[in-house]
Amino acid sequence: MTAANQNYGTGRRKSSSARVFIKPGSGKITINQRELDVYFGRETSRMIVRQPLELVEMTEKLDLYITVKGGGISGQAGAIRHGITRALMEYDESLRPVLRAAGFVTRDARRVERKKVGLRKARRRPQFSKR
């Protein structure tokens, strides 16, 4: 891809990170050299990816080229959404308030809580027996 008339955004969520390049086009979304429908089997993940574009009504106006790595399906979808949002803001700064109101600009800082010593999981204690 050439650097002319394209915008870039980096998105992160959980342990996933996505690099999003947008340029004027017909609405084609390519993730890791695969179509959106092929890459994400679940409709919910596809919906999450499309949310910022649908909000600003640019679904058919921009082509997206995305590389994403790390994490699982949900984290990758969230990272892509965050990256698309940042790329859209670079493309047109006037979209920021609309995207901010929808909550797409803020990076979701929630992470998996670590497992503690003496517990079964992060917070799950071993079963207590009185006798």
From Swiss-Prot:
GO terms for molecular function: RNA binding; structural constituent of ribosome. Belongs to the universal ribosomal protein uS9 family. The gene is rpsI. It comes from the Bacteria. GO terms for cellular component: cytosolic small ribosomal subunit. Keywords: Ribonucleoprotein, Ribosomal protein. Pfam families: Ribosomal_S9. GO terms for biological process: translation. This is Small ribosomal subunit protein uS9. SUPFAM superfamilies: Ribosomal protein S5 domain 2-like. It comes from Mannheimia succiniciproducens (strain KCTC 0769BP / MBEL55E). InterPro entries: Ribosomal_Su5_D2-typ_SF (IPR020568), Ribosomal_uS9 (IPR000754), Ribosomal_uS9_bac/plastid (IPR023035), Ribosomal_uS9_CS (IPR020574), Ribsml_uS5_D2-typ_fold_subgr (IPR014721).
